[in-house]
């Protein structure tokens, strides 16, 4: 599942991951992501941190309460968040749009 409020990021990530053979579900905000998560839990989540309403850290916390072993990759345009990601119980942190190969390699690490 891809959770990001920016349409351009949604389109880029969706195209890249579908080209890799993944089925991509997406949500534009935390509430939508949690509703979809409860209906059909994904195998992995790529999650933006800065979103209107519920931020990515709160979404991460709620998803982990429901499924502790869910791999979550935090994604943000802000490099400074990278130093904090370990305290947020995510599996990885990738700077948004900086390196698509890094994000794809991280996803492959968890999904094969």
Task: For the regions a language model picked out, list residue spans one by one.
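Short hydrophobic/Thr-rich beta-strand motif most characteristic of the beta2 strand and flanking loop
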Residues: 21-28, 36
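Acidic catalytic/metal-coordinating carboxylates
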Residues: 29-32, 55-58
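Conserved phosphotransfer cores of two-component systems
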Residues: 38-40, 62-69, 86-88
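Alpha4 helix (beta4-alpha4-beta5 surface) of REC/receiver domains from two-component response regulators
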Residues: 58, 78-96, 100-105
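Active-site residues of response regulator receiver
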Residues: 48
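Hydrophobic/aromatic residues positioned on beta-strands within the core alpha/beta folds
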Residues: 73-75
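Receiver (REC) domain active-site loop signature in two-component systems and cognate sites
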Residues: 51
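Charged docking surfaces used in two-component/phosphorelay signaling
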Residues: 11-19
